[in-house]
Amino acid sequence: MNFHHYVYVVLMSEEVLQHLKFLKANPNYQKGKSCLYVGMTGLDPDTRFDKHKAGIKANSYVQKYGLRLAPEFVADLRQPMSYEDARYLEVDVAIRLKEKGYAVWQA
């Protein structure tokens, strides 16, 4: 099995909350909590973040509002994993963070 995928979280500026689509996706957002993007990649997360910021296969919210990687939200998931595990955990992490009141975008 090929273990080179990662789940990563990006901290975004609260300015992303100006987007109605983002707000509608986060009806349980608790004001003051972080705005986050959760993704998965076959690249090193630092490289993937740099590509987002450069506009290469970028999520528009991350490109415009991404501040930094936020590994503290996935501290237990820093090791490479299979594509299938990363795909599952990307969704799982996003759901768990939303349940805790964070504003989360996961595509």
Where are these regions (language model features)?
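Aromatic/basic micro-patches that form nucleic-acid/chromatin recognition or nuclease catalytic surfaces
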Residues: 43-46, 50-107
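GIY-YIG nuclease catalytic motif and its immediate N-terminal context
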Residues: 1-50, 84-93
